[in-house]
Swiss-Prot record:
<keyword id="KW-0539">Nucleus</keyword>
<dbReference type="GO" id="GO:0005634">
    <property type="term" value="C:nucleus"/>
</dbReference>
<dbReference type="GO" id="GO:0051301">
    <property type="term" value="P:cell division"/>
</dbReference>
<keyword id="KW-0158">Chromosome</keyword>
<keyword id="KW-0131">Cell cycle</keyword>
<keyword id="KW-0498">Mitosis</keyword>
<keyword id="KW-0175">Coiled coil</keyword>
<comment type="similarity">
    <text>Belongs to the SPC24 family.</text>
</comment>
<keyword id="KW-0137">Centromere</keyword>
<feature type="coiled-coil region">
    <location>
        <begin position="24"/>
        <end position="124"/>
    </location>
</feature>
<comment type="subunit">
    <text>Component of the NDC80 complex, which consists of NDC80, NUF2, SPC24 and SPC25.</text>
</comment>
<dbReference type="GO" id="GO:0031134">
    <property type="term" value="P:sister chromatid biorientation"/>
</dbReference>
<keyword id="KW-0132">Cell division</keyword>
<keyword id="KW-0995">Kinetochore</keyword>
<dbReference type="GO" id="GO:0031262">
    <property type="term" value="C:Ndc80 complex"/>
</dbReference>
<comment type="function">
    <text>Acts as a component of the essential kinetochore-associated NDC80 complex, which is required for chromosome segregation and spindle checkpoint activity.</text>
</comment>
<protein>
    <recommendedName>
        <fullName>Probable kinetochore protein SPC24</fullName>
    </recommendedName>
</protein>
Length: 189
C-alpha cells in the first residue's frame, strides 16, 4: 500500500500505463488538418470575395449601360415628338388626302375627255363621207377627219399648234418642244 501513498510513484505508474504517443500523433494530425482546412477556407473566401467584386463590377457596368440606353431612348422619343410637332403629321395627312382626291378628280376628268374624244372620233369615222363637204363642196376624206380629230385632241389637252410649234396653253403658251420635233408631229398630222 505504500505505493498508493506515494504520489510521485503513483503518477509514474499511471503514466506508464498510458500510451499517449498515438494520441499526440492524432492531435498533431488534427492540428495539421485544421491548418490546411483553414488555409483552404481562406483561399475559397478570397476567391469568392474576388468573384463577388467582379460580379458587382459587371453589375455596375450593366446598370450604367441600362441607364445610358434609357437616356438615349428618352432623347430619341423626345426628338421624334419634336419632329412630329414640326412636321404637323395630321395636317400633312390631310394635305396628302386632299391631293389624292384632286388627282382622282383629274383622272376622272381626263378619262371623261378621252371618252368624249373617242366618241367624237367614232362619230367622225361613222359619218357618211358623201354627206360631209367643205365650203367648196369637196368631200372630206378619212385622212382629213383624222387630222381634225388630232387637232381636237390637242385642243382638249390645252395644246395648240402655232407656227409649227406645240404650245402649252396652260403655261402662258410656252413651247412644249423644239421646232424640229413639233414639225415632225405636224408632218404626222
Amino acid at each position: 500500500m505504500s505505493r498508493l501513498n506515494d504520489p510521485v510513484e503513483l503518477l509514474q505508474q499511471t503514466r506508464s500505463n498510458f500510451i499517449i504517443e498515438s494520441d499526440v500523433s492524432n492531435i498533431k494530425e488534427i492540428k495539421s488538418n485544421m491548418r490546411q482546412l483553414t488555409k483552404l477556407m481562406a483561399e475559397k473566401q478570397t476567391h469568392h470575395n474576388e468573384l463577388m467584386k467582379q460580379l458587382q463590377s459587371q453589375l455596375q457596368r450593366q446598370q450604367t449601360k441600362v441607364q445610358a440606353l434609357k437616356k438615349n431612348f428618352q432623347e430619341q422619343t423626345s426628338q421624334v415628338k419634336r419632329v412630329e410637332d414640326e412636321l404637323n403629321i395630321p395636317k400633312l395627312q390631310q394635305d396628302i388626302d386632299k391631293l389624292v382626291q384632286e388627282i382622282n378628280q383629274l383622272r376622272d376628268t381626263i378619262q371623261e375627255g378621252i371618252q368624249k374624244v373617242v366618241e367624237t372620233q367614232k362619230q367622225l369615222l361613222n359619218d357618211d363621207t358623201d354627206a360631209a363637204h367643205t365650203i367648196d363642196e369637196e368631200p372630206i376624206g378619212k385622212d382629213d377627219k383624222i387630222r381634225v380629230l388630232k387637232l381636237k385632241l390637242f385642243h382638249s389637252l390645252d395644246v395648240a399648234l402655232y407656227n409649227d410649234q406645240l404650245l402649252d396653253l396652260r403655261n402662258e403658251a410656252r413651247p412644249l418642244s423644239s421646232s424640229s420635233s413639233s414639225h415632225n408631229i405636224w408632218d404626222e398630222l
